[in-house]
């Protein structure tokens, strides 16, 4: 993957800022808090350990964890979580565009 472009310091001489560092930490905290309401904490710990073993304690690891948790929460809520306002009313498949395989009615 390509690296993020280097940010040049502002003309007024203020120090450089980290690209999205504070935002990533804040969003990760919010998503982890929401994920704990819907998923088993042991699963989230295992996922965090897996991401940490692949990326270490880096912003890339935090971003990957955010992406995975966002997708998991979306699918979970779309499939019909009782706590969700966006869940579907009919309880068939969370992906209505995917046809049911033959013989599996």
UniProtKB/Swiss-Prot annotation:
Q: Which GO terms describe its biological process?
A: symbiont entry into host cell; symbiont-mediated arrest of host cell cycle during G2/M transition; viral penetration into host nucleus
The keyword Disulfide bond appears for this protein: no
Any single Pfam family the record assigns to this protein: VPR
Modified positions (Phosphoserine) in chain numbering: 84
Q: What is its main location?
A: virion
Role this protein plays: Stimulates gene expression driven by the HIV-2 LTR. Prevents infected cells from undergoing mitosis and proliferating, by inducing arrest or delay in the G2 phase of the cell cycle. Cell cycle arrest creates a favorable environment for maximizing viral expression and production.
Q: What is this protein called?
A: Protein Vpr
Tell me which species this is from.
Human immunodeficiency virus type 2 subtype A (isolate Ghana-1)
